[in-house]
Amino acid sequence: MAIERTFSIIKPDAVAKNHIGAIYNRFETAGLKIVAAKMLHLTKEQAEGFYAEHSERGFFGALVAFMTSGPIMVQVLEGENAVLAHREILGATNPAQAAPGTIRADFAESIDENAAHGSDALESAAREIAYFFSAEELCPRTR
Ligand code: GDP
Ligand code: MG
């Protein structure tokens, strides 16, 4: 088992509904440790840059509008096979198809506003972590 780091966003809908603590509890219950965290209100440019891979999709404008609609929490999670472990507790992109007990099944209303983000691979995790955090902001959990 490899210790990995992955990147998480609690999106504006879940922050607005006061679900930050409940979602952090899901991370910790799954054995994922938070090694960096902060609240941000994304600019249009930040949201467009983060989701650049989707810039040609029909939903891109709606996605950027949603992601800039209120504050978010961004965090780095560390643990065994963290990328996959985090995607598993997150659930499918469309909450209507997310497995019972997953974050998106329990906290999201629709594919447009689906509560949380998780990196889909180690490479995207490294890129997404670096998009929001400097190396000095990551706090190894050695104790
Ligand atoms: P994820 O990795 O599970 O978040 O899914 P994707 O990388 O495929 O899409 C990124 C984000 O774009 C999703 O989490 C949704 O917020 C949004 N998204 C994806 N598909 C749709 C769609 O059909 N309509 C809208 N409005 N948003 C979508
Ligand atoms: Mg994705």
Curated annotation (Swiss-Prot):
One of its GO terms (cellular component) is cytoplasm. The active site is at residue 117. Pfam families: NDK. It catalyses: a 2'-deoxyribonucleoside 5'-diphosphate + ATP = a 2'-deoxyribonucleoside 5'-triphosphate + ADP; a ribonucleoside 5'-diphosphate + ATP = a ribonucleoside 5'-triphosphate + ADP. The keyword Cell wall biogenesis/degradation does not apply. Keywords: ATP-binding, Cytoplasm, Kinase, Magnesium, Metal-binding, Nucleotide metabolism, Nucleotide-binding, Phosphoprotein, Transferase. It is an enzyme of class 2 (transferase). Major role in the synthesis of nucleoside triphosphates other than ATP. The ATP gamma phosphate is transferred to the NDP beta phosphate via a ping-pong mechanism, using a phosphorylated active-site intermediate. This is Nucleoside diphosphate kinase. It comes from Shewanella sp. (strain ANA-3).
